[in-house]
Amino acid sequence: MTMYKEYNTNQLSLELNLAYDIPMNHEARLISLFVDSIPNHVLLEEKSHTGRPAFHPAMLLKMTLFAYARQVFSGRKIVQMNDEVIPMKWLSQDTYVSYKTINNFRSSKHANNLIKTAFIYFTLLMRENGMIEDDALFIDGTKLEADANLYSFTWKKAINKYEDTLNGKTAELYDTLVQEGVDLALSKEDCETSEGLVHLLEDTEQALAAVEKAISEEPKVIKGGSANKQKRRRIKKLRNQLKKDYLPRKQRYEKNRDILKERNSFSKTDHDATFMRMKEDHMMNGQLKPGYNVQAATNGQYVLAYDIFSNPTDTRTLKPFLNSIQTLDLFQHIVADAGYGSEENYVFIIDELAKTPLIPYGMYQKELTRKYKNSPNNPCNWNYLEETDQFMKPDGVIYSFKSYSRRCDKYGFQRDFKIYEADKIQDTPELEELAKTEGGNQKHIYYNPTWNYFKELIKEKLTSEEGSRIYAKRKTDVEPVFGRLKSVFGVRRVHVRGRQAVQTEIGFLFMSMNLTKLAKNLALRTLNTQKPHSDFIVLIVFKAEIVVWFYFKASFCPASLPQLLPLESP
């Protein structure tokens, strides 16, 4: 007979577990130590002194980070983890927490501020322990779908179109009221706003009341019918049209315009989401979906800063993103792909931030090809005559300076150009023909000295030994973070609505990814430096004094930065 160990779930046991314990190298311990290193003046918020005491934010933050590290994003499932998973019980100290408490904490303004501050402390921790290399920030972006209905779009062009039609109908109604003898206290142009329509409705109501009074003073029977009753019928019809149709539509259009701001679209179920083209296009029709543009700054595949934007492209996000990074002074090199290369971004990074951009411009790779370098139609391949301020085309056509030009884009950035026009008198009649367009006009080119200066500077930086070495790390530094976010954590769509809530959730995701990666790296480092089967303790030393030892936009910074020291267990 085969022997088995005794197994009986109905057997009464006298053994009582009075404490929950987890291994010393467990990621839950690192999460707990990191959160405990954040000072109380950052963790705690001002609460009411009456009523039931609130749960400590440190406990809620630990629970949320550990749940996100285990790819659990539902409030009810986090509560289930708290009932079943021992590391979660250890973090919460076996405290019962409702799913509403978890969800309220995740969507609160305090959690948003708390996770932003946590990234500052994490960056300082990484730098103090020598885990930040080359003083470089690697920046990239990805798009995540919003928690919004797919066909809940509202388009700016549609609002403008329908509002123009409504203004035309309102003008016709205004003229009709004037023909009916209604005394109006505002002009026709004033009726193009909701406030103007409200005043127009009030004037119409007063005119209708005056007609009602006139009807009450008339005899009951009038031969041929009462003219006032016919007038009342016409004015009442106009009043109802204005009250039930024109005014609500105008108010809805103005409300939608306030929601849009500078965007071209938004979702009715998540007003902060913007419709964008996603990489995951399963229908292969370029379908637009509501989403957010997530920007992340990394070093060593650790996310050190992040933010979300409504811009579908990355070019316009770089400047506000860099302004939001409070530890930017720790880094000298800003590394990104060609999607961020623009004159405005180069001016901002070099002139205002005094940083080194390792960001190629859009034509950088193409300009390195032999075909582009040998093309006679590219002004960069022409011979510049500095003494006479002229360009000579390879075919011999001379272009002389004509005038200056300034262009301003819709965002307010100005670009200065020099216009060069082909001379009417060339050395030969053949060249004079080449100097003209098909329409018989003189050819001309626009030359941007500032842009060409930055192009040459970027080429020099990217081809230098240090610049090429740092830029070569970009693909293996920042892009794996998004791959891990989407493939390992399975996050291609956010789970909350509203910009603040989405920003907080993305922060929880990135911080949980950082801490789990850090725990694995520490475990590997310990295995490589210590004897097999030996445990290690991650010790975070924190001193509660506050000093400002370098300039950044946060108000506080630890005097003794956190340190990670692998120690042998006794």
Kindly give the residue locations of the regions a language model identified.
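A ubiquitous short alpha-helical element
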Residues: 1, 46-50, 466
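Bromodomain acetyl-lysine reader domains
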Residues: 85-87
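Hydrophobic alpha-helical membrane-insertion signals
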Residues: 1-29
